[in-house]
Amino acid sequence: MAHPDGMARLLKFGVRNVPVVAKGDKFVFGQVIADVAELVGVKAPGQVGLTPDELVSRWLFVLEAAQRYVRQLPTGKLEERAVANRDRSIRYLGFHVFRIGEALLEVTEGEEMTVERPNVPPGDTVHTGDDIARYGEQVIVRIGQWWGQTADKACANRVPTYYGQQPLRDVLERCVWHSAQHVRQLMALLERWEIAPDRPVTDADLKGLPVPAGIWE
């Protein structure tokens, strides 16, 4: 968090996770733009976005790119922090890209999207980039199977999340851009070490996804 008093304000509300928008003594989670608009007193913007089918296709593309990049990560760097001000290893970051996908699959099976669900750390058997990529392959296959079998192609069903009941389509979109943002970070790490990412993901590839402007936001 960039604001020096930001965490203190969150703790005052009993909140430990971002994004959060606060106004006076009220706050809402920032995942739902309509809730934010209501809090600040403006009209919510109309949102169309990608269709669920486009989101799944974009997600698989992003996850396959992540497989390439984690294989390029130097093993000796995996326990280093991705950024100095956050206690998260590069190994964790690479695993997290795919764990987001597994979390969404669990939600489609009736589980709640809690804060903790996509943040499960890698197990003791995940040590190398190849280990992460193999885990990623399992997730990619399962996402493809789920999408091929689901009858709810509009993703209209509402699912429980830590920020309330939400349409599955919106939770899917959040998971897709969340993975995509971390893939951008993996590319940035490779470039930091002067390793050219294998077939870089471009801004054009991510068009239509609400990824943050900054790579480390």
Predicted stretch roles:
Residues 1-6, 16:
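Thiol-based oxidoreductase modules, predominantly thioredoxin-like and allied folds used
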Residues 11-22, 31:
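Structural micro-motif
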Residues 22-48:
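Non-catalytic, surface beta->alpha helical segment in thiol-disulfide oxidoreductase systems
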Residues 42-55, 124, 131:
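Short, charged, low-complexity loops and linkers
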Residues 50-74, 95-106:
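Alpha-helical bundle segments that constitute or directly flank the non-heme di-iron/ferroxidase center
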Residues 59-70, 124-159, 166-185:
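Acidic/histidine-rich alpha-helical segments that form the ligand environment
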Residues 77-122, 160-217:
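Short, contiguous alpha-helical
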